[in-house]
From Swiss-Prot:
One of its GO terms (cellular component) is nucleus. Residues 38-50 have a biased composition (Polar residues). Signal peptide: none annotated. It comes from the Eukaryota. It comes from Mus musculus. This is Forkhead box protein N1. Gene3D superfamilies: Winged helix-like DNA-binding domain superfamily/Winged helix DNA-binding domain. It is found in: Nucleus. GO terms for biological process: blood vessel morphogenesis; epidermis development; hair follicle development; hemopoiesis; keratinocyte differentiation; lymphocyte homeostasis; lymphoid lineage cell migration into thymus; nail development. The gene is Foxn1.
Length: 648
């Protein structure tokens, strides 16, 4: 045991010869007897021994020379301050600071003696036994740097070192953690260097000023410190001497903190915003046969929406109630031959499928982010809901989109590079206009028309239509590029622009998109018109939509007035050669002096009297300045770099 001896003025340190020669037993001596210590200087030696009892009573059993003598000091006698000195292992004590010790029986309230099972027992630290209920109380008094020790069962052989808690940081500040937490034997010289290389300071207060710090240590954990025979001072050279050492794996000088929970909580999937009827509809819609038992519906919901894996079982009751009460589902007989009630299958009511599909799309548009967060595989949402354009061929728009007018969307913005194709007006195919559809009321009575069968390959943005009003407002100096209605088909084509200008059309012929798709972000054509965003439903074509297009950097450039006067056509130079849209028939310019255009094979006799560059769709045109001596006449091109202008 490593402890602090009282000053030499109060305690006499016996040598090894005295240990061997003294008889067994306890020799209790009072102060002032001949064997009492004589006054000496205040510099005491640091020794690997226990305290000396009152007066100073000593117990010197006949033990081997390497065994320490056990003693306990009087509370008023032992004083000192331990520091590492430069001498050969001696530690000097400062008289300015006191180290009050006390006996095991008459100690103050902070003494661990009150935790013993009977204070009348003779003092013997190796024979003290603590029970669990007693030591649990003592554990509250043990603290080092604000942290208590770990405890296991009964403890034996403790030494008490009352220390002020405010000065606990100064207690052996430079000792490495291995010196406290390991029980390995240290070489004498190495351990001496550890002690001498750091200041060992114990700054106590009076015993009645506060609770003390008690260092409990088991008896069998030994270390070897450099010393002469027992009760002698430290020296670099000398024999090794086993003392109980505080640093054991079971009672380390270290902080005892609760272990942090290393397992992070997995993010919980939120409850899907879909109703139970919608979830059942998704399960039945994505089944192979169109009908499922209740157990398979459960499996579908737990597989795609993990919330139901940990949800209370009440959700299964809700599923069963929806199946039995909702008219969108009907029970069908199991064709496998099972007649039990559990073997019945559930299928969709054919008359309610459209309604459920609309409801499904509405919820997806309402909060698509929340829908995907609740799914185990968000990328499967579109496949579970169904093809967004599965109803693209419905009669909502009057006719199916053939050719290039496929499911791909057309965005009336700047086209992608590399898609520039020379574009020429077409002759409208004779035929009645399509009937009125729901979009007519929405768009002011102007319905989109299907392109003529003569040119099925052209984009709907170039399809013919009846006489319409401009889709977008035309500011002063901006006119629509449309021939007057009274022009006969064999009349010359009205002039496009003066020779110094050329017109370019912005379009994207690779794909087409209906106006309904433009208004509905997700492209759902199966929903009612009241499901459209009200901000788009109630807009005025002369206002909000135009402002929105202007916000998208769709700037306008002035256009020269377009007339159908025959005299203006003579100002045009010979037009360039005709170009075609692959793979259908192309429109060729006749090459006559008047700049007339005619379809291929028609010769120079016929020209286009009515030219409509757009119907319900918008086309963006810009004039590009060219030298007045340009040999080529005006032509309509697809150009990704031109600034668009809306025409109707």
């Amino acid at each position: 045991m490593v402890s602090l001896l009282p000053p030499q003025s109060d305690v006499t340190l016996p040598g090894s010869t005295r240990l061997e020669g003294e008889p067994q037993g306890d020799l209790m001596q009072a102060p002032g007897l001949p064997d009492s210590p004589a006054p000496q200087n205040k510099h005491a030696n640091f020794s690997c021994s226990s305290f000396v009892p009152d007066g100073p009573p000593e117990r010197t059993p006949s033990l081997p020379p390497h065994s320490p003598s056990i003693a306990s000091p009087d509370p008023e006698q032992i004083q000192g301050h331990c520091t590492a000195g430069p001498g050969p292992g001696s530690f000097r004590l400062s008289p300015s600071e006191k180290y009050p010790g006390f006996g095991f029986e008459e100690g103050p309230a902070g003494s661990p003696g009150r935790f013993l099972k009977g204070n009348h027992m003779p003092f013997h630290p190796y024979k003290r036994h603590f029970h669990e209920d007693i030591f649990s109380e003592a554990q509250t008094a043990m603290a080092l740097d604000g942290h208590s020790f770990k405890t296991q069962g009964a403890l034996e052989a403790f030494e008490e070192i009352p220390v002020d808690m405010g000065d606990a940081e100064a207690f052996l500040p430079s000792f490495p953690a291995e010196a406290w937490c390991n029980k390995l034997p240290y070489p004498s010289q190495e351990h001496n260097q550890i002690l001498q290389g750091s200041e060992v300071k114990v700054k106590p207060q009076a015993l009645d000023s506060g609770p003390g710090m008690y260092c409990y240590q088991p008896p069998l954990q030994h270390m070897y410190c450099s010393s002469q025979p027992a009760f002698h001072q430290y020296s670099p050279g000398g024999g090794s001497y086993p003392v109980p050492y505080l640093g054991s794996p079971h009672y380390p000088y270290q902080r005892i903190a609760p272990q942090a929970n290393a397992e992070g909580h997995q993010p919980l999937f939120p409850k899907p915003i879909y109703s139970y009827s919608i979830l059942i509809f998704m399960a039945l819609k994505n089944s192979k046969t169109g009908s499922l038992p209740v157990s398979e519906i459960y499996n579908f919901m737990t597989e795609h929406f993990p919330y139901f894996k940990t949800a209370p079982d009440g959700w299964k009751n809700s599923v069963r109630h929806n199946l039995s009460l909702n008219k969108c589902f009907e029970k069908v007989e199991n064709k496998s031959g099972s007649s039990s009630r559990k073997g019945c299958l559930w299928a969709l009511n054919p008359s309610k499928i459209d309604k459920m599909q609309e409801e499904l799309q509405k919820w997806k548009r309402k909060d698509p982010i929340a829908v995907r967060k609740s799914m185990a595989k968000p990328e499967e949402l579109d496949s579970l809901i169904g093809d967004k354009r599965e109803k693209l061929g419905s009669p909502l728009l009057g006719c199916p989109p053939p050719g290039l007018a496929g499911p791909g969307p057309i965005r009336p913005m700047a086209p992608s590079a590399g898609l520039s194709q020379p574009l020429h007006p077409m002759h409208p195919a004779p035929g009645p206009m399509p009937g009125k559809n729901p979009l007519q009321d929405l768009l002011g009575g102007h319905a989109p028309s299907c392109y003529g069968q003569t040119y099925p390959h052209l984009s709907p943005s170039l399809a013919p239509s009846g006489h319409q009003q401009p889709l977008f407002p035309q500011p002063d100096g901006h006119l629509e590029l449309q021939a007057q209605p009274g022009t006969p088909q064999d009349s010359p084509l009205p002039a496009h622009t003066p020779p110094s200008h050329g017109a370019k059309l912005m379009a994207e012929p690779s794909s087409a998109r209906t106006m309904h798709d433009t208004l509905l972000p997700d492209g759902d054509l199966g929903t009612d018109l009241d499901a459209i965003n009200p901000s788009l439903t109630d807009f005025d074509f002369q206002g909000n939509l135009w402002e929105q297009l202007k916000d998208d950097s769709l700037a306008l450039d002035p256009l020269v007035l377009v007339t159908s006067s025959p005299t203006s056509s003579s100002m045009l130079p010979p037009p360039p050669a005709a170009h075609c849209f692959p793979p259908g028939p192309c429109l060729a310019e006749t090459g006559n002096e008047a700049g007339e255009l005619a379809p291929p094979g028609s010769g120079g006799s016929g020209a286009l009297g009515d030219m409509h560059l757009s119907t319900l769709y918008s086309a963006f045109v810009e004039l590009e300045s060219t030298p007045s001596s340009a040999a080529a006449g005006p032509a309509v091109y697809l150009s990704p770099g031109s600034k668009p202008l809306a025409l109707a």
